[in-house]
Regions:
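P-loop NTP-binding core
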Residues: 1-281
């Protein structure tokens, strides 16, 4: 059963919060947040991407990372500064980032002692500055942590990238256990919007094997769209560009894939493929 629902009215009054999560590293979480965010922005949806990974890869893909004396999402989550004070515009119209910084390395320790520690991110994002967005996409660290739990608690939906390899597929059971615990204890309405195959290479036999297993297991919860293997996804961040900026062509492989993903995601949410100027405000 898919997470399709009519949120057309909700998009006008509050953002849709989506956590991009998988407890296995190297499956394309940051690439997905970066380029899905850019694809939604290109369709007229004001999109905020939130970097919750201490490596700050998403931040480096878009903007100069904060200096040591500048606040980032660590201080936001710890309620030391407002999220409005860290949101930065990017070179892509409608796309904004809430960056991570070096202080994220201490976030887990400080958050562990906080009251309402699992709710800290959700509370921080309940801000007028965030309500101006249509979508908030959250990039997560490659492990189950308090930060990941915070992201799930703050999210309406989860999108799960799975690279076409054996080990990431095995790791899904741990993610699903985490989701069930969050639903049971903290957020019963949390939904999985879909599973996304990444690093897809039809020439590799393992790709076909993984796809068959996952589509049989998850059925309609699997996105029809796949993100094909593409060396440009590795090259674009070095120039602080999204795949759309880097390929600069509607026929580029990455551009095609993430445009298709955005359309499919919007369809699952019963939202128009393009945000009208009037409703975008």
């Amino acid at each position: 059963m898919t997470a399709q629902t009519d949120v057309t009215e909700n998009i006008r009054t509050r953002p849709i919060f989506i956590a991009i999560a998988n407890q296995k590293g190297g499956v394309g979480k940051t690439t997905t947040v970066l380029n899905l965010g850019a694809a939604l922005a290109a369709q007229g949806y004001r999109t905020l991407v939130v970097d919750l990974d201490l490596q700050a890869n998403l931040t480096h893909c878009l903007v100069e990372p904060p200096r040591d004396d500048q606040p980032n999402m660590c201080e936001v989550i710890l309620d030391e500064v407002s999220v409005a004070g860290v949101i930065v515009s990017t070179d892509t119209p409608n796309l904004f980032v809430a960056p991570a910084g070096e202080s994220m390395a201490n976030l887990e320790i400080n958050l562990a002692a906080a009251i309402g520690r699992e709710q800290a991110l959700r509370t921080a994002l309940q801000h007028a500055a965030v309500s101006e967005f249509d979508f908030v996409l959250m990039d997560n660290p490659p492990c189950l942590s308090l930060v990941t739990i915070n992201s799930m608690v703050a999210a309406d939906y989860i999108v799960v990238p799975v690279s076409c390899e054996y080990l990431p597929m095995l790791g899904l059971k741990w993610l699903l256990k985490s989701v069930e615990k969050v639903r049971a204890r903290l957020h019963p309405n949390l939904k999985i919007l879909g599973y996304l195959l990444t690093m897809y290479d039809r020439r590799e036999g393992i790709t076909t094997d993984v796809e068959e297993i996952l589509r049989e297991q998850f059925g309609d919860e699997m996105f029809t769209t796949v993100i094909r293997i593409n060396t440009r996804h590795k090259s674009a961040p070095s120039e602080r560009k999204t795949i759309f900026q880097y390929e600069h062509s509607r026929r580029g492989r990455g551009t095609e894939d993430f445009s298709a993903l955005a359309r499919e995601l919007l369809k699952r949410l019963s939202l128009p493929a393009r945000r009208s100027r009037r409703s975008a405000g």
